[in-house]
């Protein structure tokens, strides 16, 4: 017990250290900037100084964005942590294949529900309160999953966590986008995706460390330890301000919005505050043609283009096969002849690659733009998936791991970095949560369907056929990006 407890505490102290180092980086940035204003700003990537604002304001913006984005860490952790416990659960409770499927998929169906209903609390109760309740859902799910005594208690607990995941994909990117200035919005909103990938990697490492304890209750620790970061995230959400855009759009509270803007940057002048408030309230002027879509029903012709973009960017995200490849990576590697242990090691390598190239995507998104990253990612998809299909068809198996790693890199710096940012930018204030919910629901329903179909497809079709299909879909994706997607880099929200 002492060994398991030491492993657990050591792992999560490390996680807390990572979070603390990010916050220390923001404060260190302030000290360096004030002491050596002429020095290069090496930490600008994580906490960029927004042109026209003070360093203090930039740090607050980064801290609030990071706090909201930690919902993504829990999202990634919660989604992948089950991989270390599913075999033990099936044997422990003697589950049939159907019951096993219920246990494993319960969280995924929770995300579908969460993405469907996420717009309601986000608009009705506010972004801040919704983020706080997301943390509570994660906390309840983690503790309950670790203490579950059977299939149905376990499935309900995982379903609750899935609801939190689904709502987080609606609220967190939206909240960050509404706080951020146009020329830094991509990088800050992209923190959500970066934390998803970080959560996935930490979950894989956590499972590996806890599994070494050899305890029959190791699976309970794997699931239960999520309570630590969930509790930290929930506590941090208490200090978040409400989105000034929500205060204006849904509460007509210009004074409250003014206070948030003043808290963000105490050094701002009254004249600048008036200008910022005028920009927030401009979208309520129905007499201006550019604002009429804000007051039209969501399912209306004026919103047809952003609705189509939100649906298709989420649809093509899944049609790349990324979730199937992430979930079933060991099985794919075993098809090439790798032993099970080597296949698992390759899977951890996927997590590391995903993290590194997500960071690259965040660095590029406000430099090259969203559409450019989607195009670059599409070319990477087509090349890696096409080569992978060829490698399977010619039995050149040594190429397959490299193709999979290249595919993950293309996804991480392309679609993965862009999807949540783009959806949060293309809708007006009154419909932003609806649009985010549409994109999130589309993402999760196709993820669920693909996860359901992929194991069957692997047994019914040759690998080259499956990868060839994904490659064809990414060719369609590239044509769609060229034809329909408009660049949103640096464009103010409406």
Language model region names:
Residues 263-274:
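Short intracellular "coupling" helices and adjacent cytoplasmic loop segments at the cytosolic face
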Residues 273-287:
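Cytosol/matrix-facing amphipathic helices and coiled-coil assembly/linker segments
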Residues 25, 42-262, 285-494:
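Alpha-helical transmembrane bundle of multi-pass membrane proteins
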